[in-house]
């Protein structure tokens, strides 16, 4: 009879250690993918901004590199 409470306590302790459900793993993957996409968009915007600045500096120094 003393084993029953110990068994119940062990079950309660072991339940949080159960592996994550598939739904939780999918949600984590989607969040991680969204963050990766956000990083790529920021990087593209950053690179295009650098190219615009470089182009404007080039146009101020030498007009042969300008598209206008």
UniProtKB/Swiss-Prot annotation:
Keyword Manganese (UniProt): no
Expression sites (tissue/organ): Expressed by the venom duct.
Manganese among keywords: no
Post-translational modification: Contains 2 disulfide bonds that can be either 'C1-C3, C2-C4' or 'C1-C4, C2-C3', since these disulfide connectivities have been observed for conotoxins with cysteine framework V (for examples, see AC P0DQQ7 and AC P81755).
Positions annotated as propeptide: 20-54
A GO MF term: toxin activity
Taxonomic superkingdom: Eukaryota
Signal peptide range: 1-19
Location in or out of the cell: Secreted
Pfam family, any one: Chi-conotoxin
GO CC annotation: extracellular region
Cross-referenced InterPro entries: T-conotoxin
This protein's domain notes: The cysteine framework is V (CC-CC).
Family designation: Belongs to the conotoxin T superfamily.
The name this protein goes by in its record: Conotoxin Lp5.2
Species, as recorded: Conus leopardus (Leopard cone)
